[in-house]
């Protein structure tokens, strides 16, 4: 792998070096001004992997603000907690492809009907093969179209609770046992088991009903074959780039085992055509950035820095690889390259990692503003970089599913919130890093007002909702109504939506500078559950 990375890095550095020599510099927002490339309006066909705001409009927003026309299917075609309309999505994509310069497509949507549907489907092998064939035909029918595709390896949640009801129903009962059994099988193949583990594996086989295990493993086998066929498409050039995500992964699991098998299968495919890494929800933002960078023949320089401590060596929750490896993959996906000196960078990606490498949770009681991860130092360092003229993007990953309140309070108090060029602190660490990078490499070319608009969405969601309002309202639901309402709001949804809207407006008034429309923002639940929210401003 080292030689493959070295070759690509040298190639990208060469292209970028000449671009840098030819570029002029000025001052804007505390950083060097990057002028957008003059161009005619370009069109990107975009099929998201589900209907969440982060998957759809938020992933596309930076490209749209740069002047690109991003064609997205009607949301009713996309999957959510239930299957979308893969046939309708295909006919829509086929009809729109002729007017597009590039396509960023979710193979999960076009084959299974969405990300969640990929874990629950009852499709036959023949149906799956036919749908893979459709994707292959997209390039044949539109020779000039660049096709960037992304899909997921079927995940292996650690328990029924962790699955969030997004697996087959039996996972709520047997999820922990399925996860453990798959992990022991992974270890058995790649390292061997102790006598105690061998006995535990036998006990688990007796505990999990055979029909449950058969259903789960047979679906995985079908999806695995689909992934092999998609890798073949990247091998032959039917896909210009295919990214396969190890969704909600762990070092010992079925997902990890399958990734090793697929890595061997793809040995001869260059990393410029196929990559496999932890994550999934961030891939649309990264590939849309890649499509823009390819169209404009731009290779952004990115300087990556971490909080003190283990930094890039940490293996984040829901991942099976060191963070530094995931970030290197993200850079290549976005068409960017890492540089050691921030003076030569288009942006500095500052990663807020926990010093000991152990992540917390956005909804944990200790996320009360107490500085557990030396956030004050990170905020001051970000301020010093900005004062020196560097464009800074922050990936906030000390916690899963929400921002670090201590960091955000420090950025607020130092007046830095709207001096950044990007921020993300939502869901998993790899989601946040990839999304921050995908938006960041484009936002450095945007006017300040547009950058502020992108930042506002993240602050309201990642900081306001996920780390504060959601936690408060969830606790109230548990005490006053029904703890089960978290996963299915049911009849409580209208009242909860009003409560969240009011609290989020109050949060913005206390923590953010005045911004048009924030005092009239509205909130909704795309999947009718507390975990995922959507924020709408009157003028957006």
Locate predicted features.
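Bacterial N-terminal signal peptides
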Residues: 9-20
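Bacterial N-terminal signal peptides that target proteins for export
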Residues: 1-9
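Generic low-complexity, intrinsically disordered sequence content enriched
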Residues: 15-17, 25-26, 142
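An N-terminal assembly and electron-transfer interface module characteristic of large anaerobic redox
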Residues: 31-540
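Signal peptide processing junction and immediate N-terminal pro/mature segment
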Residues: 21-33
